[in-house]
A protein has these predicted regions:
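Acyl-CoA/ACP chain-elongation machinery
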Residues: 34-42
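Active-site capping/gating regions of soluble enzymes
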Residues: 13-19, 28, 68, 81, ...
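Glycine-rich beta-to-alpha active-site loop
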Residues: 1-35
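Intrinsically disordered, low-complexity segments enriched in small/flexible residues
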Residues: 49-80, 86, 92, 97-214
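Glycine-rich phosphate-binding loop at the start of an alpha helix
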Residues: 8, 41, 78
């Protein structure tokens, strides 16, 4: 159940539940790139899985990866569950509650309704082309940099995100498991957190509440 602000790691916890119950005024999103990181708690995996299950992307996981690259790369947020639907931050089967006081009740109600028919979800798997989709992501970054939409360290962060969403070091089409995506997320997160530029961004956010461009 979410209410108010559910972004970054908080959203990663919520979105990997079987269902979410969200208050109408909830704000959701994966905003890690703004502080020099990539989602490292399953956010990349979960959002990619949601997109590849869309009928339009069943046969082309690369296109789903591009969609997710843009959503996470821009740090897109949705200020209501309705606005979150097209980004797949909230799903059609999730429950939206208008009255905040009903949030916990509706959550228990949903749990009880799932008891009799619950089935373990299918394990995510992804088929990504490797170098081909990674090069597409790199071209997006080059284009944004040439238009002065992103600068300096933004590109480095984008390259790490591209590495996660293209399947890492694989240059050929590769089938990836849920655990593979978790591992790639963690590797990129650890590399980025060691950079003083990431730490500068985190410090600025904590001390001023604002992002810096470095």
């Amino acid at each position: 159940a979410i209410s108010g602000l559910a972004i970054g790691g908080g959203f990663e916890v919520a979105c990997q539940s079987d269902r979410m119950v969200a208050h109408m005024n909830s704000t959701v999103g994966l905003v890690e790139t703004g502080v020099g990181l990539v989602p490292g708690g399953g956010g990349c995996k979960e959002l990619l899985w949601r997109w590849v299950q869309d009928a339009k992307f069943h046969d082309n996981h690369d296109n789903a990866a591009i969609e997710v690259f843009n959503i996470i790369g821009y740090g897109k947020i949705a200020t209501s569950p309705i606005l979150a639907l097209p980004l797949k931050l909230i799903m059609e089967e999730d429950v939206v509650v208008e009255n905040r006081d009903q949030l916990l009740f509706k959550s228990f109600e949903l749990i009880n309704s799932l008891k009799s028919s619950y089935q373990i979800p299918k394990r995510p798997s992804f088929l990504l082309s490797g170098l081909s989709v990674k090069e597409q992501m790199h071209e997006i970054l080059k284009d944004l940099e040439s238009q002065h939409i992103i600068f300096g360290y933004d590109v480095d962060i984008g390259l790490h995100l591209a590495d996660v969403l293209s399947g890492g070091a694989n240059s050929e089409p590769t089938s990836l498991s849920e655990q593979d995506l978790y591992d790639l997320e963690r590797q990129s997160l650890i590399k980025l957190i060691q950079s003083h530029k990431t730490r500068d961004r985190i410090h600025a956010m904590l001390s001023t509440g604002r992002r810096i461009k470095n």
